[in-house]
Amino acid sequence: MNKVDSVKPRGFGFGFIMTRHVCNSATNELWQESYRCIRKYYPNTVKILIIDDNSKQEFVKHPNLELINTEIVQSEFPKRGELLSYYYFLKLRPFEKAVVIHDSIFIKRFINFSLLDDFCPLFSFKRNWDNPNIEIPLVKQLENSKLNRVYQSKEWLGCFGVMSIISYKTINFLQEEYNFPNKLISIIDSREKRMGLERILGLLYFEYCKKNSIKMRSLFGDIHNFIQKNYSIFGFHGWSCYFMTDYNAHKYLDTTPIIKVWASR
């Protein structure tokens, strides 16, 4: 039996942080499905923190969905995207371990996140698409000379979507050691910089593993391999699954633990 799929414990030492951006009725459906998937496998005692990043509030509606043990934070920092999950986790400390996800991530089976490491990306990716003109200035903002050198190495991987499992102890360490996430909250303000953030978190994870003598890994492996293994068997390319229409129209393997839907935001 896989360690993360063992018998459900009586108590849970983690919660979920979901970054939400609603810009139309189609994207309003995504976060609700993500919430329903969480509640299908995790009881109401598991808290969900939703960080709303500059949504158009006229589209944010859920008349048929009751939110239980859920806190919604309206961020005062628009367009920061996934960085907000780490910023508010550090600021609010809603639980001791966070599962950081997008509003377009749908969990399809129970995973005992409490048994996992204090820091682990959900997905990794190879660095074939690095943009040093964006990423190096972000690294320098963290004011750690060693990171500048490590960035040039080929040893570390990107953290797809900046999604991870991370403990409060770890996020506090990253803030004290590397000024992450607070130093970047005034810097990350575009899609390109949010893509750079995927590399920054991967770089910090690499450093964390070295300091703690931990082997680097990600929970679901390389995102490109994951897409091909779990989606393509049914005759369509996973990158083409947009919004709820495509999600509902396609079949997935029963063993697929998590599904990512694309929303082009």
Residue ranges and their predicted role:
Residues M1-R265:
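ER/Golgi luminal nucleotide-sugar-dependent glycosyltransferases, focusing on the catalytic module
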